[in-house]
Design a protein with these regions (language model features):
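All-beta strand scaffolds that present successive hydrophobic residues in beta-strands
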Residues: 104-108, 128-134, 165-170, 190-196, ...
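Bacterial signal peptide processing site
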Residues: 21-24
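C-terminal motif of bacterial Sec signal peptides marking the signal peptidase cleavage site
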Residues: 16-19
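Extracellular beta-strand/beta-solenoid scaffold signature
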Residues: 88-95, 115-122, 145-159, 177-184, ...
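Bacterial Sec-dependent N-terminal signal peptides
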Residues: 1-10
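N-terminal segments that cap or nucleate solenoid repeat domains
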Residues: 81, 85-143, 462-464, 469-470
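Extracellular/periplasmic low-complexity linear segments
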Residues: 26-93
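Extracellular beta-strand/loop-rich repeat segments of large surface/secreted proteins
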Residues: 396-470
């Protein structure tokens, strides 16, 4: 056995981390009472995306009268039910067609919003309420500001904020207006939603969302979004925990299954993006997947786009704090139908993989760490740490000359080549005694730690700091 350590001086890539982000009708209530090109958020790849500086101010009349009608016998209330169904002004912009009262328990009924900047139902001001078996529709009335819609939930079908807590069970929620998210929580609010459907067909809106410190727990949902991510967050972050269910994004290249500017955990669920990346993490945020099935089909067409199933990056829009993006996958299967499996650019990132299965696209690329469309030329590479435990990895890895990679393999097997075209960025490979690396082409790295007997060159050559070592 030949134990050998080959070291080189690590050249840390400079990463320029810019701020981040993305880029009269009647209302009825019935029933139960940088130096180069700098891009904004990746979701702006879709035509429906809007940036901060495109936002317009909104003027909302909180005293505006609305009509409300209820179906007799459809509603069963307990506690202090709000029976008027009148519109009330929000803590910021926008209104609610029906405002839940503290202690209210709704069973059945239909709740509908038709006006601009109006949600069908919601709660604020420390309210605790429950909705069961209801139909909730946002059928018309576009948001007057894409920003207040995306950051504060104005115009969402369901909107909870101001430290309110709402439990939603067995409900049907639809949204068909512009910038009208399905279920939105922010400003210290909490939503527990289970066994429900959320169908969002309007532009500029996601399925279930947190922002501004909101918390959302979702269980066994069927969520479909036609414009933005089925599971998403925005400025101010929060926490989103998903267990079970199916989450599908059907929109354009800016419509991933999961978009994170928060802490997002998904377990035992199926997540599909028909025309975009499966997962996007922006800035100092995370996505953790436990025994999930995911697929993406990146159809990015913008100049300089690098197609990939998972994007870890920092944009310039101000929606996510600068820092390390973290992707963790334990078990489950992820399929890339277009492009590399992972792409890290203009940020630092950590990818943690344990006993997961990856199905590569025809490109055969597993990981790209490089400059891209975000940040300033010359300082917008990526710094990535890849940790694999009890993991099988296949595919090529590319690290450009302003980027870095540290790959740590424990009880894992890697079959592929790293920088097969020659030395570029800093690459460190740490191979445990119970791990292997089988080359599929000549590979060029900066530093190797481990037993070279565990490296099968397969007829190719391994170069460490410019020296052929095997």
């Amino acid at each position: 056995m030949k134990k050998r350590t080959v070291a080189a001086i690590l050249m840390t890539s400079a990463i320029a981390l810019s701020a981040c982000g993305e880029g009269g009708s009647s209302t009825s209530y019935s029933g139960n009472n940088a130096s180069s090109t700098i891009e904004a958020s990746s979701e702006l790849d879709s035509a429906e995306g809007a940036s901060n500086d495109q936002a317009t101010d909104i003027q909302t009349d909180g005293n505006k009268d609305t009509t409300a009608s209820s179906s007799e016998g459809e509603k069963k209330q307990k506690g202090k039910g709000s029976k008027s169904g009148k519109k009330s002004e929000d803590s910021s912009e926008g209104t609610l067609a029906y405002t839940l009262s503290d202690g209210e328990e709704i069973e059945g009924g239909t709740y509908t919003a038709e006006n601009e900047d109006e949600s069908a139902i919601g709660a604020a001001d420390d309210t605790v309420a429950t909705i069961t078996g209801a139909t909730i529709n946002k059928i018309s009335g576009d948001a007057t500001s894409a920003d207040t819609s995306s950051f504060e939930g104005v115009n969402a079908a369901v909107r909870v904020y101001g430290n309110a807590t709402v439990t939603i069970e067995d409900c049907e929620i639809t949204s068909d207006a512009e910038n009208a998210t399905g279920v939105f929580v922010y400003d210290g609010g909490t939503i527990y939603i289970s066994d429900s459907t959320v169908d969002v067909t309007g532009g500029g809106a996601g399925g279930i969302q947190v922002a501004g410190g909101g918390t959302l727990y979702a269980e066994n949902l069927t969520v479909t979004s036609a414009s933005k991510a089925a599971i998403r967050s925005d400025r101010g972050g929060g926490m989103l925990v998903v267990t079970g269910g199916t989450y599908t994004s059907t929109g354009s290249s800016g419509c991933p299954a999961i978009y994170s500017t928060a802490e997002i955990t998904v377990s035992d669920a199926e997540c599909v993006s028909e025309n975009s990346r499966a997962v996007i993490i922006e800035g100092k945020n995370s996505v953790t997947l436990e025994n999930c099935t995911l697929s993406g089909n990146d159809q990015s067409t913008k100049e300089g786009s690098i197609k990939a199933n998972v994007l870890l990056y920092q944009s310039s829009s101000g929606d996510a704090e600068d820092g390390t993006s973290v992707f963790t996958m334990n078990g489950g299967t992820m399929t890339s139908n277009s492009g590399a499996m992972f792409y890290c650019t203009n940020t630092s990132s950590v990818i943690n993989l344990t006993d997961a299965t990856f199905e590569l696209s025809d490109t055969g690329e597993f990981l790209i760490v490089s400059a891209g469309r975000w940040g300033s030329d010359g300082s917008n590479g990526g710094n990535c740490v890849l940790n694999a435990e009890e993991q099988t990895i296949e595919g090529t890895i590319t690290v450009d000359d302003i980027s870095s990679l540290e790959m740590n393999l424990e009880q894992s097997d890697y079959t592929g080549a790293i920088n097969s075209s020659g030395q570029a960025g800093t690459v460190v490979v740490n191979l445990s005694d119970d791990s292997t690396w089988t080359l599929t082409a000549d590979s060029y790295i900066s530093e190797f730690e481990g037993d070279l007997d565990n490296v099968d060159t397969n007829g190719y050559h391994l170069y460490v700091d410019g020296v052929e070592v095997k």
